Amino acid sequence: ENSMLKSVMADAKKGDSFMRQNRIKKFLTAGLSGLLILSLTGCGQAAKLPETVENTSLVVEKDGKVTSYLVNTFDKDFYNLDGLTQMVEEEAEEFNATHTEATENPMNVKTVQVLGDGAMVQVVQEFADTDSYAEYNEQDLFYGTRVEALAQGLTVNREFVNAADGTPADSEKLDKALEKNHLIITNASAYIYCPYPVLYISEGVVMGEDGYVDASQSDGVVT
């Protein structure tokens, strides 16, 4: 009788954790905008991350590693910090377990913490590369050259504006930039911190004052 009760409780717990996991997925997803493309220069100062990240942000490193900062309202009716941390870590373990061929974990949880007065929570995850980020979050994120983008079947449209002032890009200069520099292509709604200064951006995207790209409201450009 006791073992029967145990298994019923275990099932109830499973159902509960499944529901909670669905909630956590919703909570953790950065959200989708249209596909946006950023063309980067090959040198210069990259955007500087603030000391406390209070907006959902993606940081792409020169070697393609990605740090994801997810910031959301902390609903104490649904989560407590320990439970949230446990769920985030379990999801990471499950994701990494499906990638046993990888030499390093595709994803690691860095921190789960409440910000400031406790109204917001921030989850920081590190991804080995843009593909791992894209797969885990079911979003698009590409960092590489135009040739690599085309090889992956991504179309690079040419509806760019100058990052500096929002004026339409000069097509000759744009071609040169696209030939030799890196691109970031994504549909994540987030502040995007690029490894190099941004030269050209899709229409509908805003440059932040510290050099980041504000794609949090954007419909981007669907390519």
Each model region followed by its residue ranges:
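Bacterial N-terminal signal peptides that target proteins for export
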Residues: R20-G31
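Mature, soluble, non-transmembrane domains
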Residues: Q113-T223
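Short, Lys/Arg-enriched N-terminal segments with co-localized hydrophobic residues
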Residues: E1-F18
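C-terminal motif of bacterial Sec signal peptides marking the signal peptidase cleavage site
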Residues: S39-G42
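N-terminal Sec/ER secretory leader and immediately downstream segment
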Residues: P50-T111
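Bacterial signal peptide processing site
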Residues: G44-A46
